[in-house]
Design a protein with these regions (language model features):
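Single conserved hydrophobic/aromatic residue that forms the stacking wall/gate
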Residues: 99-110
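Short boundary/loop segments of OB/S1/cold-shock single-stranded nucleic-acid-binding domains
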Residues: 7-26
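Short nucleic-acid-contacting surface segments enriched for D/E, G, S/T with interspersed K/R
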Residues: 65-79
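OB-fold (S1/OB) nucleic-acid-binding surfaces
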Residues: 45-58
Length: 110
């Protein structure tokens, strides 16, 4: 019996490709509470969005920060427009934030 055996890298690359091709996971709006927010010296912002049922890791690259008119902080309720993708090296998925529009109310859009 012949078995297909794949490397970790092959599996992660395949999963990344599946995420990229899934139209539901591209340009998706996700709402949640900002958690674990860290501004990196590179200009990127690393954070998580959470709600009562789960959490997703997020990244906003420095080049995407132009439209962000407020400083993200722990506990803010936000809506993020982005693409769900994978970080192949670690085999983890994350939300890659694309655009940011803020509102003056407690609910902000990023």
């Amino acid at each position: 019996m012949m078995r297909n055996v794949y490397s970790v890298g092959q599996v992660n690359a395949y999963i990344k490709n599946m995420f990229t091709q899934d139209f539901m996971l591209n340009r998706i709006y996700v709402k949640g509470e900002v958690s674990n927010c860290k501004y990196h010296t590179s200009g990127h912002i690393y954070f998580s969005l959470k709600d009562e049922s789960g959490m997703i890791a997020c990244i906003m690259f420095a080049g995407q920060r132009g439209g962000l008119s407020f400083r993200m902080q722990e506990g803010q309720q936000v809506i993020v427009l982005g693409n769900v993708t994978t970080y192949e090296r670690d085999g983890k998925y994350q939300l890659l934030s694309l655009i940011h529009i803020s509102e003056p109310t407690r609910r902000s859009y990023i």
